[in-house]
């Protein structure tokens, strides 16, 4: 689709772009679709539904097929969320939770094109095989960092204890009676 992508910084006054973020710039000439001419075209495009929630809610399925959570689980959820137990329609809440769980299960079962590629960037609660970060790797990573003068970063300019009322040898001084003797 794109020939190449590169990360670049857009510089303006003071070395920062107007929103302080990095921008992606395409060096290729990719065409996605017709260019929008005005805000009405954008609103029309965004208001057109691509898919309906009703497809995945299972409204046509009978309520007997749904497996509602137990009444004890619903009461526990109500207590944990701080909602009142008194006057709560437990049966209605069970059916709503069953429909929501059914919807979530159907979303998880939707086939995704290029699933091998998307698994690397999966944001679901999936265990990832990451390498453990230890103290030596952290120090090694810090040693390779350099300040960017274009962004106004100056090496050694920040002192953590600079605004502290009392400090000694670049450490904060905490007195025992600090919170006890407050007025």
From Swiss-Prot:
It comes from the Eukaryota. Transmembrane segments: none annotated. One of its GO terms (cellular component) is mitochondrion. It is found in: Mitochondrion inner membrane. Keywords: ATP-binding, Ligase, Membrane, Mitochondrion, Mitochondrion inner membrane, Nucleotide-binding, Protein biosynthesis. Its EC number is 6.3.5.-. InterPro entries: GatF. Its main location: mitochondrion. It catalyses: L-glutamyl-tRNA(Gln) + L-glutamine + ATP + H2O = L-glutaminyl-tRNA(Gln) + L-glutamate + ADP + phosphate + H(+). CDD domains: GatF. The keyword Cytoplasm does not apply. It is a peripheral membrane protein. Allows the formation of correctly charged Gln-tRNA(Gln) through the transamidation of misacylated Glu-tRNA(Gln) in the mitochondria. The reaction takes place in the presence of glutamine and ATP through an activated gamma-phospho-Glu-tRNA(Gln). Required for proper protein synthesis within the mitochondrion. Subunit of the heterotrimeric GatFAB amidotransferase (AdT) complex, composed of A (HER2), B (PET112) and F (YGR102C) subunits. Belongs to the GatF family. Present with 172 molecules/cell in log phase SD medium. This is Glutamyl-tRNA(Gln) amidotransferase subunit F, mitochondrial. It comes from Saccharomyces cerevisiae (strain ATCC 204508 / S288c). The gene is GTF1.
């Amino acid at each position: 689709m794109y020939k190449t992508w590169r990360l670049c910084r857009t510089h303006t006054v003071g070395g920062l772009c107007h929103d302080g973020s990095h921008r992606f710039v395409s060096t290729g000439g990719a065409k996605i679709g017709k260019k929008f001419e005005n805000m009405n075209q954008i609103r029309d495009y965004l208001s057109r539904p691509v898919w309906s929630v009703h497809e995945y809610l299972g409204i046509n399925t009978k309520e007997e097929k749904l497996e509602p959570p137990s009444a004890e689980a619903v009461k526990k959820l109500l207590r944990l969320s701080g909602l009142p137990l008194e006057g709560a329609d437990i049966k209605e809440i069970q059916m709503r939770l069953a429909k929501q769980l059914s919807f979530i299960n159907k979303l998880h079962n939707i086939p995704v094109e290029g699933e091998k590629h998307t698994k690397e960037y999966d944001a679901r609660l999936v265990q990832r095989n990451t390498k453990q970060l230890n103290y030596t790797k952290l120090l090694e990573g810090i040693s390779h960092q350099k300040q960017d003068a274009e962004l106004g970063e100056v090496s050694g300019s920040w002192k953590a204890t600079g605004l502290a009322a009392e400090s000694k040898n670049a450490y904060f001084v905490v007195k025992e009676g600090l919170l006890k003797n407050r007025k």
